[in-house]
Amino acid sequence: MAQRVQLTATVTENQLGQRLDQALAELFPDYSRSRIKEWILDQRVLVNGSIGDKPKGKVLGGEHIAIDVEIEEEARFQPQDIPLNIVYEDDDILVINKPRDLVVHPGAGNPDGTVLNALLHYYPPIADVPRAGIVHRLDKDTTGLMVVAKTIPAQTRLVESLQLREITREYEAVAIGHMTSGGTVEEPISRHPTKRTHMAVHPMGKPAVTHYRIMEHFRIHTRLRLRLETGRTHQIRVHMSHITHPLVGDQVYGGRPRPPKGASEEFITALRKFDRQALHATMLRLYHPITGIEMEWHAPIPQDMVELIEAMRADFEAHKDDIDWL
């Protein structure tokens, strides 16, 4: 059911020179800047009685604002008592270390049991923040650090920081193949043309940039540290598959087990039982959305990746005399 919302306000003199969408986000803090921008583009905002349809247009101060919109009532997700590993919290943000097998947001096939449901239980006021404060996501079986906004102003500023590439996200991963050097993958990503749940490199996709460097070599695998410039769905997984080095365990993008020649039964078993993409969000750095202070968090790789890497090291040591690139 749609709800009619009518809002009025006057731009203050202190807002002189601000963008229209920025000024309105301050005047109407109960609504996100992205939603206000949609209203502007939909010509639902009147500035001194005339349609204001340019989000980047500057305000002078003193303008009378009138907004008349209908808002579809959002689906009501239920709070659920799901444990969250919280590594930092203040009045404005949460940083969590997400485990494997946990979806971030409800969707097709996952109506509940998500990070969002857990947030609603842990901090009920977050229900008033768009998407319960979730500003970026990790795949279901990717582990590691995520920041969540507890208030609308914090959410607005974090979204802006992501768009401006001011938030640094670094990952650890294990890729298939012997990689000789680090590098950058700069290839656009879009939905796969025939597989609805897959992504793919495509010339008409959205820009995507992934930087990577080598941390450790194994016989036919490589441990990597990666940094995202952009945050497309499945970005690291798609980019590494595109350069023929899919992540270990990533059966969607070609990471099925490939034991090296002469591998022990123990190592073959370790590879086969690792049933998720070997990817962990290990570092998060950002400017606090309210105080502006630079903050940084680290999360060590989880036990399943520790055991995988230890098995690869043992295999490497057992066969290093036979490796021709040493």
Regions found by a protein language model. Give the residues of each.
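RNA pseudouridine synthases
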Residues: A2-L326
